[in-house]
């Protein structure tokens, strides 16, 4: 970049120290010069005292892309110290050569943060200590980097932009010492501001013992000003999880409050300090990024084992009895008991995505999927055997045909194989009838133990005719009145006698004036 390009700078920005005034830069500061939507960064080390606005700097300033908005702070690394500067706009038409002369006039001033006249608005950043003193000191592994201590009135209510011609003075405070310097950090550092690489401290400042949020609580927290656009998304949050230390905490470095206001989310201060009756909530960025907060993680002991049961289990002879507290049914293992408890609670956690049908077990859902896919992996390859009253099987046996039926589950194939072998393993204990499936035996048991009849009969077997006549006495009286008028006789008694098969043998009508008696002979 040639010298005439420096003269065409429409609006230059001078670095302004946070705590002092002056017009020169220290040689170790990485300086950035702004023009419009570009930033000029030094490509080579600076001399002892030089002004980057001078025309002599135009030959080694290289343009870099700049973010849409400018930040209020610039972090400059000086050895192991981190100094924060703010860009100060220079008025249009300022002589760059005059600025260089002002910088050279401050060259021989004593080190430290020195302030000159506030009218000319010249600022400088000096070495906090000389190089010879730095070489005599031992290794600075136990020392912390200085950080800016923002005053209370500046952090709570910043002045408006039109009144902030010069930044408020800020003091540099030493940070608490750290234990050790880690070369490999256990966390991923995301840049909040891609256009400002200097806004993030160097990696050696982040150690296991102290986090940036502990050392410098206001680091990376810009003032709450709506004029600064949102430069970082809340999902790009940094998190540190220290597994090696028992007192490890989860700390997050959040962008300035304007980022949360622009996205319509709550401020970090509101999430950290909720009301007295409200529970603390986690950062929304962590949930959106796919990282769950430790506060929401339930211990594994409450999810597995006997702790998941709503009641304690009993022990007998040193062994745990997996017994249901509702129906008293016992099981051999805990998983079967948990599945059984879903029958009483009505819980069906496994749902089909196609037909929305729910199941109590995952195996049932997997078997149900075969209904939608039409897959029948289980095939019968046994020749037909003549069965009892099974004409089709007899014809197939004569022709020596092989059954090629297919089934979606192995249980259905097992039941089908009983048809070929003629096995009937389920036998009734009352009438000695045998069945191929257990469900057929359960339906057969209802014939031997009929349920008590109610007022409403949905199914009316022959054995419940006597019960029907007993409960509907009023209907029989109405029938008697109608018969007397039209047929000339009354229905005084209905005699119903049934056999064990439930068939009615005799129903007698008499004209005697005796009351209706069920289940008794006419002589009685």
From Swiss-Prot:
- What GO cellular-component annotations does this UniProt entry give? nucleus
Q: What is known of its domains?
A: The C2H2-type zinc finger are necessary for DNA-binding.
Protein name as annotated: Tissue-resident T-cell transcription regulator protein ZNF683
Q: Does the keyword Kinase apply?
A: no
Cytoplasm found in the keyword field: no
- Output the Pfam families linked to this UniProt entry: zf-C2H2
Alphabetic keyword roster: Adaptive immunity, DNA-binding, Host-virus interaction, Immunity, Innate immunity, Metal-binding, Nucleus, Repeat, Transcription, Transcription regulation, Zinc, Zinc-finger
Induction of synthesis: (Microbial infection) Up-regulated by cytomegalovirus (CMV) infection in long-lived effector CD8(+) T-cells.
Query: Tell me, what does this protein do in biology?
Result: Transcription factor that mediates a transcriptional program in various innate and adaptive immune tissue-resident lymphocyte T-cell types such as tissue-resident memory T (Trm), natural killer (trNK) and natural killer T (NKT) cells and negatively regulates gene expression of proteins that promote the egress of tissue-resident T-cell populations from non-lymphoid organs.
Family matches, as SMART domains: ZnF_C2H2
Known SUPFAM superfamilies for this protein?
Answer: beta-beta-alpha zinc fingers (SSF57667)
> What's the superkingdom here?
Eukaryota
Please give the biological process terms from Gene Ontology that the record holds: adaptive immune response; cellular response to ionomycin; innate immune response; negative regulation of transcription by RNA polymerase II; negative regulation of type II interferon production; positive regulation of gene expression; regulation of extrathymic T cell differentiation; regulation of gene expression
Molecular function, one GO term: DNA-binding transcription factor activity
**Organism, as annotated:** Homo sapiens (Human)
Q: Where is this region: Disordered?
A: 130-166, 265-303
Tissue-wise, where is it found?
A: Expressed in terminally differentiated effector CD8(+) T-cells, but not in naive and central memory cells. Expressed in terminally differentiated natural killer (NK) cells and natural killer (NKT) T-cells (at protein level). Expressed strongly in effector-type CD8(+) T-cells and weakly in naive and memory CD8(+) T-cells. Expressed in terminally differentiated natural killer (NK) cells. Isoform 2 is strongly expressed in effector CD8(+) T and natural killer (NK) cells. Isoform 1 is expressed in effector CD8(+) T and natural killer (NK) cells. (Microbial infection) Expressed in cytomegalovirus (CMV)-infected effector CD8(+) T-cells (at protein level).
Q: Where are the zinc fingers (C2H2-type)?
A: 322-344, 350-372, 398-420, 426-448
- List the biased-composition ranges (Basic and acidic residues): 130-142
What's the main place this protein lives? nucleus
What family is this? Belongs to the krueppel C2H2-type zinc-finger protein family.
Can you say where in the cell this protein is located?
A: Nucleus
């Amino acid at each position: 970049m040639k010298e005439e390009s420096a003269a065409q700078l429409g609006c230059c920005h001078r670095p302004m120290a946070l705590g002092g005034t002056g017009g020169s830069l220290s040689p170790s500061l990485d300086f950035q010069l702004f023009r419009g939507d570009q930033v000029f960064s030094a490509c080579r080390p600076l001399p002892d005292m030089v002004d980057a606005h001078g025309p002599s700097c135009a030959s080694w300033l290289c343009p870099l892309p700049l973010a849409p908005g400018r930040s209020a702070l610039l972090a400059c690394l000086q050895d192991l110290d981190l100094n924060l500067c703010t860009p100060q706009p220079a008025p249009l038409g300022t002589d760059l050569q005059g600025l260089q002369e002002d910088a050279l006039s401050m060259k021989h001033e004593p080190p430290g943060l020195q302030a000159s006249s506030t009218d000319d608005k010249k600022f400088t950043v000096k070495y906090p200590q000389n190089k010879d003193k730095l070489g005599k000191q031992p290794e600075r592994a136990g020392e912390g980097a200085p950080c800016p201590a923002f005053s209370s009135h500046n952090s709570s209510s910043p002045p408006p932009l039109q009144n902030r011609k010069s930044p408020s003075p800020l003091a540099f405070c030493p940070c608490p010492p750290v234990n050790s310097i880690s070369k490999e950090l256990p966390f991923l550092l995301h840049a909040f501001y891609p256009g400002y690489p200097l806004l993030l401290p160097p990696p050696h400042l982040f150690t296991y013992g102290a986090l940036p949020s502990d050392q410098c609580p206001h680091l990376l927290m810009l003032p709450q000003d709506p004029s600064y656009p949102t430069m970082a998304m809340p999902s790009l949050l940094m998190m540190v999880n220290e597994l090696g230390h028992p007192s490890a905490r989860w700390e997050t470095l959040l962008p300035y409050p304007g980022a949360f206001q622009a996205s319509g989310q709550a401020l970090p201060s509101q999430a950290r300090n909720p009301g007295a009756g409200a529970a603390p909530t986690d950062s929304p960025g962590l949930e959106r990024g796919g990282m769950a907060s430790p506060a929401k993680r339930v211990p594994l002991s409450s999810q597995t084992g006997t702790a998941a049961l709503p009641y304690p289990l009993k022990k007998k002879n040193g062994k745990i009895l997996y017994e249901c507290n509702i129906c008293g049914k016992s099981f051999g293992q805990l998983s079967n008991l948990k599945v059984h408890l879903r029958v009483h609670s009505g819980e069906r956690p496994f749902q089909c995505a196609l037909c929305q049908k729910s199941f109590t077990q995952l195996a049932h859902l997997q078997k149900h999927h075969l209904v939608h896919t039409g897959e029948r992996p289980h095939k019968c390859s046994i020749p037909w055997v003549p069965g009892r009253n099974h004409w089709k099987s007899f014809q197939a046996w004569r022709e020596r045909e092989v059954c090629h039926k297919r089934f979606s589950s192995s249980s259905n194939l097992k039941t089908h194989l009983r048809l070929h072998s003629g096995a009937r393993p389920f036998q009734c204990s009352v009438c000695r009838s045998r069945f191929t499936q257990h469900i057929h035996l359960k339906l057969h048991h209802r014939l031997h133990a009929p349920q008590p009849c109610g007022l409403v009969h949905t199914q009316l077997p022959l054995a419940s005719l006597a019960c029907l006549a007993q409960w509907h006495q009023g209907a029989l009286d109405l029938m008697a009145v109608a018969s007397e008028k039209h047929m000339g006789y009354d229905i005084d008694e209905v005699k119903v006698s049934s056999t064990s098969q439930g068939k009615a043998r005799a129903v007698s009508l008499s004209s005697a004036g005796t009351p209706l008696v069920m289940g008794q002979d006419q002589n009685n």
